[in-house]
């Protein structure tokens, strides 16, 4: 991304208001919408300006190689114990892509309950550290892997979700400036994903958005829900996008697609796509 500052005042103020409230702050949203930038850049800058010492800000990025070992729940727990002990004042813990903290899958076929337990052990870690008076927890996670329903259940009412969306036009225009009509046309065409600012050509922007779409709707969803009919998922999404703004329902989709999928299966596919 270019060295331009993108303001996300609405979300930043929500983090500021929630500071030190005893809740786990969960910053969620679709991939690449600016969750990490909000937490590790804008909010961190705010804390430093408020006088928080750098050593009192613990930063973990579980999608990066340098922190890969912390994807193991036991390793993450031990690291947090060590990095928060013996410090004066509040310790602010930032964990990027928290859903990557999970035990590796074994060789035998696991039940849905076993899969959920293996993938959600990080909740126990966060719940324990949330209760420590000198620790303030902030985590990020993608919608396709970290559902609001999971958060509400696992944190027992002590988790606060901040849903981050791509840039609004006002945020977009504040960053790009120039002729407002031209900016509006570009925004309508390509949307408000922050990383588009680093791309100079239309071809690069199209390729980026196509790749992002495939990652979100196919790799993430197919992986999380272990779908075996991703071909039909693609067809359902094609129909939905071509009929944007029109009313539809599972019966109409089934009739239009002419597939062997029934209404119940199409309804399930609609549910998982809306989760993103």
Regions found by a protein language model. Name each.
Residues 2-22:
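Pre-Walker A adenine-sensing motif
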Residues 5, 163-276:
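Interdomain hinge/linker elements that couple catalytic modules in large macromolecular machines
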Residues 27:
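Hydrophobic anchor at the beta1->P-loop junction of P-loop NTPases
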Residues 35-36:
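Conserved lysine of the Walker
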Residues 58-89:
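Short glycine-rich substrate-engagement loop in P-loop NTPases that contacts/grips substrate
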Residues 94, 136-142, 163:
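Structural recognition of the conserved hydrophobic beta-strand(s) that form the central parallel beta-sheet
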Residues 99-138:
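Conserved Walker B catalytic segment
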Residues 144-160, 176-177:
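Short regulatory helix/loop adjacent to the ATP-binding pocket of P-loop NTPases
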């Amino acid at each position: 991304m270019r060295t331009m500052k993108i303001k996300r005042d609405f979300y930043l103020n929500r983090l500021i208001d929630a500071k030190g409230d005893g809740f786990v702050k969960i910053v969620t949203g679709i991939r690449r919408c600016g969750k990490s930038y909000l937490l590790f850049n804008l909010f961190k800058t705010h804390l430093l300006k408020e006088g928080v010492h750098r050593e009192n800000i613990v930063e973990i990025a579980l999608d990066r190689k340098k922190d890969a070992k912390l994807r193991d729940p036991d390793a993450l727990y031990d690291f947090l114990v060590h990095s928060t002990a013996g410090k004066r004042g509040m310790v602010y813990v930032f964990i990027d892509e928290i859903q990557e903290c999970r035990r590796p899958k074994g060789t035998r076929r696991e039940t849905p309950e076993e899969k959920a337990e293996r993938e959600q052990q990080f909740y126990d870690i966060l719940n324990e550290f949330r209760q420590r008076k000198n620790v303030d927890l902030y985590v990020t996670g993608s919608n396709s892997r970290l559902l609001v329903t999971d958060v509400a259940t696992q944190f027992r009412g002590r988790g606060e979700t901040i849903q981050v969306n791509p840039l609004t036009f006002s945020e977009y225009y504040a960053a790009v400036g120039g002729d407002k009509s031209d900016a509006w046309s570009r925004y309508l065409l390509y949307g408000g994903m922050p990383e588009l600012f680093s791309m100079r050509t239309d071809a690069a922007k199209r390729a980026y958005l196509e790749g992002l779409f495939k990652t979100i709707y196919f790799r993430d969803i197919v992986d999380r829900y272990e779908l075996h009919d991703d071909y039909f998922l693609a067809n359902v999404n094609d129909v939905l996008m071509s009929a944007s703004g029109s009313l539809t329902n599972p019966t109409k989709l089934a009739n239009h697609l002419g597939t062997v999928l029934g209404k119940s299966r199409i309804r399930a596919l609609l549910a998982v796509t809306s989760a993103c």
